[in-house]
């Protein structure tokens, strides 16, 4: 069973380590400890630890805005292939649509992260477009796909 809880300052060592491992494959860009602390303190940002059986297995960061949009800014799961990411996103979708009255839940995902793209599609996310070569990585650039799910699509 997967649960989400608010990230605490003492979780940052885990968060930074998990993030570094994910950055090697260009799935996320490393944030500084200060940037994570700012996100933890920001009332419009949900910085959560993903847990299973009392163990930290990942983290996610989502951002609220005044137009009732909710952006999944990043999700990092340390233990891949066990369904933890899918369960965490389902919990976040439930929170967004049922507790804080989100209209649109959106994210962007690197085009080479085909596993994540399939997961989002299976959860009902629709492609909105491609931002071509918009993220610098090593000596080149990677493209990202913007995806979203609307409240009416979630409720079906």
Where are these regions (language model features)?
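Acetyl-CoA-dependent GNAT
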Residues: 6-10, 16-80, 95, 99, ...
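Core beta-strand residues in small-molecule sensory/regulatory alpha/beta domains
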Residues: 51, 131-132
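Conserved acetyl-CoA-binding loop-helix of GNAT-fold acetyltransferases
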Residues: 82-96, 117-122
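Conserved GNAT acetyl-CoA-binding A-motif
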Residues: 99-108
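Conserved beta-strand-loop-alpha-helix junction that forms the acyl-donor binding cleft
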Residues: 107-117, 134-140
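Conserved active-site tyrosine of GNAT-family acetyltransferases
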Residues: 120, 125, 147
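Terminal substrate-recognition subdomain of acyl/acetyltransferases
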Residues: 140-156
């Amino acid at each position: 069973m997967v649960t989400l809880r608010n990230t605490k300052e003492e979780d940052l060592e885990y968060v930074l380590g998990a993030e570094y491992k994910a950055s090697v494959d260009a799935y996320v860009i490393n944030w500084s400890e200060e940037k994570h602390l700012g996100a933890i303190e920001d009332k419009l940002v949900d910085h959560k630890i993903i847990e299973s059986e009392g163990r930290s297995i990942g983290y996610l960061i989502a951002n609220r805005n005044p137009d009732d949009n909710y952006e999944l800014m990043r999700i990092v799961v340390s233990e891949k292939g066990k369904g933890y990411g899918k369960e965490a996103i389902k919990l976040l979708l439930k929170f967004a649509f049922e507790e804080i009255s989100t209209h649109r839940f959106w994210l962007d995902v690197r085009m080479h992260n085909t596993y994540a793209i399939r997961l989002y599609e299976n959860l009902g996310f629709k492609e909105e477009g491609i931002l071509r070569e918009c993220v610098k990585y090593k000596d080149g650039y990677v493209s990202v796909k913007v995806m979203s799910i609307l409240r009416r699509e979630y409720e079906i």
